[in-house]
Amino acid sequence: MRYEVWEKLAHKYNRLWVQKYSLRPTRRDVKTILLPLIKKNPDLKILDIGCGTGQLAKEVSARFPKINYMGIDVASNMVALAKASNKGENVRFKVCPIEKFNADEKFDVIICTHSFPYFPDKEKMIGKIADMCKEGGNVIIVNSSTNSLKDLIINFFLKATTSKAEYLSIPKMKKLFKATGLTLKKKHIIREKFYMPTLALFYLEK
């Protein structure tokens, strides 16, 4: 995984064109699931894998200031910006790839948006995510997915602008989930523009 790409993108990440048609709609749809869960249980422990500049954390903690939120990312520049824009006492960030992250606690909700394609060993990582999730807890994964020739072409160019990635099809993602004992509660396609690849949201329960 080439971390330097994300270090260089950090200072302009919040202004990238993909914010409008991919990242912002993703946060919107994740919050549709996440906010009701927090409303029921304000003490939820949340892990955000690949938290970037902490945009989701900021939007969620604005509604729930006392939320227990941990964000991790491989890029130190991203994490520095996340810390600068999130001042909640229970919102924490750490520079750490998921492969090396050793949690001393389990989480009620684990979120991974637009990071999963960059994990070299996807089966191992989804297993680790499942292990870090509490029994009865939830996992929300969103990523670009290759399910058609159009997706294949768009994702090829997307991969060329970031770092090495593999955009699994929806059936392949479902197979991974099944192997780790995660139950798919909902699959949702985020549709904004015709020239965007399939953005698949998976809402899972352990």
Predicted regions and their residues:
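Conserved class I S-adenosyl-L-methionine
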Residues: 1-39, 55, 59, 140-163
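Class I SAM-dependent methyltransferase SAM/SAH-binding core
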Residues: 47, 53-100
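A conserved beta-strand element that flanks and buttresses the S-adenosyl-L-methionine
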Residues: 111
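Short catalytic micro-motifs in class I SAM-dependent methyltransferases
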Residues: 114-115
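A short glycine-rich, Lys/Arg-flanked "PGG" loop and its adjoining helix->strand segment in the class I
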Residues: 123-135
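Short alpha-helix
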Residues: 165-181
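Core SAM-dependent methyltransferase catalytic element
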Residues: 189-206
